[in-house]
Amino acid sequence: MGVSFSCPFAEQDDVEAALDSVTVKSISFGDDDECKTPKRSVNFNDGTLEPTILKSMGSGKMVVEKSVSLKGMQLERMISLNRSVKDNGFEIAKEFSVLDPRNPKHEAAIKLQKVYKSFRTRRKLADCAVLVEQSWWKLLDFAELKRSSISFFDIEKHETAISRWSRARTRAAKVGKGLSKNGKAQKLALQHWLEAIDPRHRYGHNLHFYYNKWLHCQSREPFFYWLDIGEGKEVNLVEKCPRLKLQQQCIKYLGPMERKAYEVVVEDGKFFYKHSGEILQTSDMEDSESKWIFVLSTSKVLYVGKKKKGTFQHSSFLAGGATVAAGRLVVENGVLKAVWPHSGHYQPTEENFMDFLSFLRENDVDITDVKMSPTDEDEFSIYKQRSTHMRNHSLEEDLEAEKTISFQDKVDPSGEEQTLMRNESISRKQSDLETPEKMESFSTFGDEIQSVGSKSTKVSEDYDSGDDEEEEEEMFELEQESMPSEQSSPRGEEKEEGETKESEVVKITEESILKRINSKKETKSFQLGKQLSCKWTTGAGPRIGCVRDYPSELQFQALEQVNLSPRSASVSRLCFSSSSQTQTPQMSPLWRGMSLPTDITLTNS
C-alpha cells in the first residue's frame, strides 16, 4: 500500500500575486487495485480561504512529496523538500559573501595580508643590511690576510693573525650607519643605525642591548628575525631594558608630507611655521619642562618640534637622515632667545653650530642677545660635574692600565699578542676622551662618532645635557660588550685562525673590492647618501641603501640568508636553526629571479 502526495506550485514573478496550485492525491493498495481521487484546483485569489503554505523568500517553485508504504508491519516515511531560489536567496550567498571583492570584510582581509607581507619584507631587508655589513668586514679581513697590497687599513706596525681576526670581529660588531650629502653632515652611531633600519624604528638605545645579546649567543639567525620571531623572542633583559620598554618606545619617523607640518621659515627675523603660518612659541606656562629641538637639513630647511623621549627625537624629522646642524632652542613669540648644539643622535660639532649661526644671519636673525648655552643653569652645572668626574675617573683607570701593561711586558716579553689587544682596548678608551689632530680619510663605524675636532669635543662636553646623559654614560659599556675578545667568540664564530673556514667567505673579485674602497675614499665618508639609488625620504632608505651599496655577490648572499633569493632554500638550512626553519615563510613569487627588490625603493617605512 502506498500513498503519495504532491503540490507543484506555479512559478510566480511576484510573491503577493495570485498563486494557483494543483493537488493530486493518490492511494494505491498494490499493483492491480488503484484508487485515484479527482483533480482539485484551489484558487487563493479570493479572501475566503487563508493560505496555509509556507511563504518563500523569493519567487520560485516548491515541490512537496510524501509517500507512505506498509510492508511487513514496517512503516517508512519520507519527506523531501526541494526549493530553488532565483533572486533573493541570500542563505547561499551569505556563505560566500566574504569572497566577494566588493565586500568590506574581503577588502580588510586582503589589506591585512598585504600589510603583514610588507612588514615581513622590511624585516628581511633590515636583516640583509646587518648581514651584508658583517660580510663586508669579514671579506676585507680575508683580503688583508692573503694580500697586503689592499691599502684599506692603515697599519703602522705588524699584527699577529689572532689580533687581526679579533679586530675583524670588533668591526663586525660595531656596524653603524651614516650619511654624507654635503661633507659636513654628522653620522649616527651603531644604536641609531639599528634604529633606522628597524621596521618598527624602536629606540636605538634600547635596541642596542638586545643586539649585544645576539652577538654573544650561539644563534645563526639574523638579528631582527632572532629578536621578533626566532630564538630571541622570549629574551627579556629586565635589568638593562625590559622587553615591554623595547616594544613601547618606538621613534616616529616622519614622511615627506608629515614633516611639512614641522617646517619653519624665518621672516623679518621671526620664526613661523610654514604650513600653518602660526608664530613659533616654545615657552609654555603649562609645560615648563618641555624641550624643543631643531634640525637643519642638508638642503637648508629648518624643522622644529617638541621632543618626546622614546617617541619623537632629532632623527624623527628626516627619518634618520643627515643634517647640517641639530640642537635645542627657545623661542618666545617668534623671537629666538636661546640655542645650543645638543643631539644624542647627530653629535653636532662646533663647525655644525657655526653653520647654523650663519644660516640665522642669512635670514636676518639678530643673535646679539641670544644665549648659546642651556637655559637651565642647574642642569648645566650638574652635567658638567658629571662629565668632569667621568673624564678624571677614566684617565686614572687608563694610567693604571698602562703601568700594569708596562710591568707585564718587562716580566713576560713573549706576551706580544695580549699586549697588542690591551693597547687596542686602551686606545679605544682614549678615543672617547682625546681627539686626534687629523681625521683619517676613512674611519671605521665605531670610531667615526668619536672623530671630531678638539673644539667640538669641548662644545659637546659643555652643551650636552638632558635625557641623553644616561646614554652617553652607558655608551662605552655597550661598545665594550660589542667587542668580543678571543675568549668569547660571538654567534658561534671560531676562536682561532686555524678553525676558520675560508669557504664561508664569498669570493669577490679584487676589482669590486677596490672599487667600493675607492668610492668611500673619494667621498671622505663611509656613508650611504651618495650611493643611494633612491631619494632618502623615509625609513626605507637605510634598509634598501645598505644592501645596494655592496658588491652583488654579498647582496646575493645576504638575500639568500633571509629567503629573499631563489637559492635561499638550500642556504636557509645552513643559516637558520631547525626551530626557525618551520617559522620562516616561503619566498614570494614577487622576488623570484630578482637580485634585489627594486619596487620597494619608494615604499614608506
Curated annotation (Swiss-Prot):
Induction annotation: By light. Down-regulated by treatment with mannitol.
Q: Where does the IQ domain lie?
A: 105-134
Q: Give the start-end ranges of region Disordered.
A: 408-505
Q: Which UniProt keywords apply?
A: Cytoplasm, Nucleus
List all Low complexity biased stretches. Answer: 481-490
Please give the InterPro entries that the UniProt record associates with this protein.
IQM
Q: Where is the composition biased (Basic and acidic residues)?
A: 425-440, 491-505
Its Gene Ontology cellular component terms are: cytoplasm; nucleus
Q: Which PANTHER family match?
A: IQ DOMAIN-CONTAINING PROTEIN IQM2, IQ DOMAIN-CONTAINING PROTEIN IQM3
Q: What is this protein called?
A: IQ domain-containing protein IQM2
